[in-house]
């Protein structure tokens, strides 16, 4: 048995022990699922997939989402975002990667995320959009690129009534990190909601 075989076997044993101690759960209904599954069969059938309505054109580009933000999807995303429940990340990343591949194909040069402010990062302990971008990147074996920095701690978007108020709320809230590295490139910009 070579060193790489031994490492592979140790990784399998470690993963098996983790699955035994912390069984994987469906992020949408909390039901136990197999160690290689990302979602339970029931949720896979009944989730509110966006299907052929995944993409919407905006004044600054196209946006896409694999699922409608309602019921179990909303709960799972909020549990991830505000309670730090990371178990759903592989599922969220897989669904988002599949949606992005179908809707945007190779129309981007790199993947980035919408960062949180330093204040929210300290309070929450993690940047949920960065984690989501990272889980999507795992599917494609690439690394997300940091392109933006949030420079204003503006009010949360969730408390705003309409698209105009949300647009005004983020105006001037971000700056480019190393603008010379991103000039002329197209990015898949990942956010949680």
Task: Describe the predicted segments one by one.
Residues 1-193:
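Glycine-rich phosphate/pyrophosphate-handling loop used in enzymes and phosphotransfer proteins
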């Amino acid at each position: 048995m070579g060193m790489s075989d031994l490492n592979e076997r140790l990784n399998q044993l470690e993963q098996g022990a983790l699955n035994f101690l912390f069984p994987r759960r469906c992020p949408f209904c909390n039901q136990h699922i197999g160690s290689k599954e990302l979602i339970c069969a029931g949720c896979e059938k009944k989730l509110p997939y966006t299907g052929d309505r995944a993409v919407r054109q905006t004044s600054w580009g196209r946006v896409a989402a694999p699922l409608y933000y309602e019921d179990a999807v909303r709960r799972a995303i909020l549990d991830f975002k505000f309670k730090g429940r990371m178990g759903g990340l592989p599922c969220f990343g897989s669904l988002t990667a599949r949606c992005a591949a179908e809707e945007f194909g190779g129309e981007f040069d790199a993947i980035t995320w919408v960062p949180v402010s330093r204040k929210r990062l300290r309070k929450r302990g993690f940047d949920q959009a960065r984690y989501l971008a990272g889980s999507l990147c795992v599917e494609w074996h690439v690394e997300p690129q940091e392109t933006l920095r949030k420079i204003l701690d503006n009010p949360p978007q969730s408390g705003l009534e309409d698209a105009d108020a949300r647009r005004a709320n983020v105006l001037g809230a971000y700056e480019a990190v190393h603008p010379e590295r991103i000039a002329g490139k197209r990015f898949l910009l990942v956010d949680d909601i």
